[in-house]
Amino acid sequence: MNQILIKISLAFIALIECSGFSLVFAQGNRPVGTWKDHFPYEKVLEVTSGGEFVYARTDLAVFSLNPASHKVNKYSKVQGLSQSNPTAIKWYDGDMENDVEGFLIIGYANGNLDLFQDGGTYNLPDIVTSNIIGDKGIRSIFVEGNFAFLACGFGVVVIDLERFEVQDTWYINGQQQLLEITSVVLHDDIWVVATASGVYEAPTDHPFLSSADAWTRWEDLPESASSYVSDLIYFGNDILVHLGDETSGRLWRSLDGSPWELFPGWPAEGTELHSLATNLTTSVVPENEVLLIGLCCSVERYDTEYNLIPEINALGGWLQVRDLEYDKNDPGVIWIATLIGGLVRFVTDPIEGGTNNGVFFPGGPDNANVRKLDCWNSNLWVATGGVDETWVGLYTSVGVHGLVDGNWIDVVSLEGENDISGIRDFLCVSIDPLNPSHIMFGSWEEGLIEVLDGEMVAIYNSANSTVVEGDFGSTPRTGVAGVDYDKFGNLWFTNAYSTSPLQVRLADGTFIAMDLGDSFTSNDNIGGVKVTRDGYVWVILPRGGGILVYDPAGTPGITSDDDWRFLSTSESQGALPSNYIYSIEEDLDGEIWIGTGSGPAIFYRTESLFNDDNETTASQILIQQDGNYQYLLETETVTAVVIDGGNRKWVGTSGSGVYVLSEDGMTIENHFSSENSPIPANSILDIAINHGNGEVFVATARGIISYLGEATNWDPEMESIFVFPNPVDEFHQGPITVDGLDFESIVHITDAAGRVVGVVESMGGRAVWDGLMSDGTPAPYGVYLIFAVDRDGNTSASTKLAITR
């Protein structure tokens, strides 16, 4: 096919990610209790323009661009959207005669619908709450006048955009044979719908468009009248249809009613097509109509005679086009949704000093893949691979990335080393406590991967270490599923399906394999690892194998004095509630919390773990609920446990989101789920905490999101306590925090006359005051004094707070 690549001179515009809120806080700060998404915004699937903005849809959220200022705003559940799975967007211009402002229409995979303006979101749940059985997902949105036509998995839903209500539902093939609709087109006085089984039309003046009797199928469609139609467009009086899915179909055309023919140059075996567009959607009537065809990795432009328009600059094929639209206000600008370049602005006829080409997207990770997290203050690193329930690798090779000092970075490969993007299934990650820029990853295929200052510096396998290949069946692989640094900088890790399943890389770089005798064979799997402060190494044995606890006796370089034991549901082996183990964590009191398939279990004392009397057993917390006694979260599979600065337990589950437990575990202080919070999915894979600022990172099956928590690390000296926000103005409605405190400090807030208006206790180094007087009213205008004293009464500190509201 004769292709002309629209190329762009890519002068990348470095854009800081922006919030959709108009907050008055200093840059980099945000109130306690607020959320922030860490979604990939570079992979844009759809674009629509209108008003002063251009909107782009990703797999998890939406973002807007102001073309004049280049300001980018993110819109996810954090900013008030209903869900985290948008599938279609379209701009509605509004109706000035009836004083209706324009807004963005957002459709979701389950049929939910948001009508979104900067001022808020109006949710229309009629489809998702309907009794329709089957796929309710919204495929695309067509707007005509004051109505939106939603192409859904069962038919077309007509929305009155002035009344915010469903006006009609078109069942193209009847309510007994629901038909998936891919797009809706209006041509002259005829409605045309593309479906999963051909093309149907009906006159616009038909009184019963909800009836199948109103619709006629195009029986002359090429290939088959029941072909899957992924796209359809009118170009003048010509019709173009793409038969087959987006990845491999054929583009056909009918010239002014003539017989169908394969589009000139289109491969007979089919190829990718992701968008068909014309410039007739602009508010400015163009001099000549132009057709755009968005292929896999290029864009073609044709005039009305189907002549390729002469080459105009360059668009690199690496962008991977997914959607196209002419700017509604400027027909000289084409907006291109791409998987790698974000939202691309292409100027068809650039002039000096005018609008430039550009690439736009908010900051974020390259992808939403995540299995494990590790965080050390302002350093968060993500292992992006995975295995299925039988521990077969997912063959995910998307590299690794980290959030360092607030910026997402990708690990790069040094010259002469293997390309890190080709390494599959990173399962685990650990940050060196002696050097937070030094990170070690475990791969299910390649062994240990060492990263320093954002660069991959080494791969450790049988060629240069004690790490060996394991018997994974037909293909030998070097599988490392667990890594954890101890406080001395020694890296403990597991080596699956080998005779050396537990190993350590000492801080000096020496590798040592632990001698476990005949406890393991090359047929045994071995998973995650956690080193506790007493030096014990706790190892997860996957798929119902329980736990291995290893005691290196304080000498990891000497194996002759070591000991180990296995824990299981057996009374003589720790009495775990389940042999299915997913997470191990140590709290601030030295208690070991185990995430099992039957809720959390706790080892309150581990000093006698290796005594012969076998008295160390796991406990479960008995609570009373609805008048009945039961074990805490006993029906949940606990996939993650992490401890915050206040010794609270953040518990992730396989299907119920995140529970926040009190220090003793007896009280559920909070429960975050996709139903009551911005968490994108209830399947929690891992949790990590930045103890420096209290930010809790939650890894879900649909990406990472964070919550600014109420607890941080503490400072026994309390030399630099500070209040946020300060001053508190009329716009602030949330809590007021005091940071830099000692553990469990008592904080008194007094007015200028010395009257106590609030007393709070810190969680770790942070105290949170609701800003209310004793009668529940907001503290009034004035200067307040903050007095803090540690729990022993030995150290104190003070500061001031101004309230200006």
Model-assigned labels for residue ranges:
Residues 53-56, 103-106, 147-150, 191-193, ...:
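Conserved beta-propeller blade signature
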Residues 785-805:
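C-terminal tail/sorting-segment detector
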Residues 383-398, 446, 498-500, 545-547, ...:
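Short, conserved, GDST-rich strand-edge loop motifs in beta-rich repeat architectures
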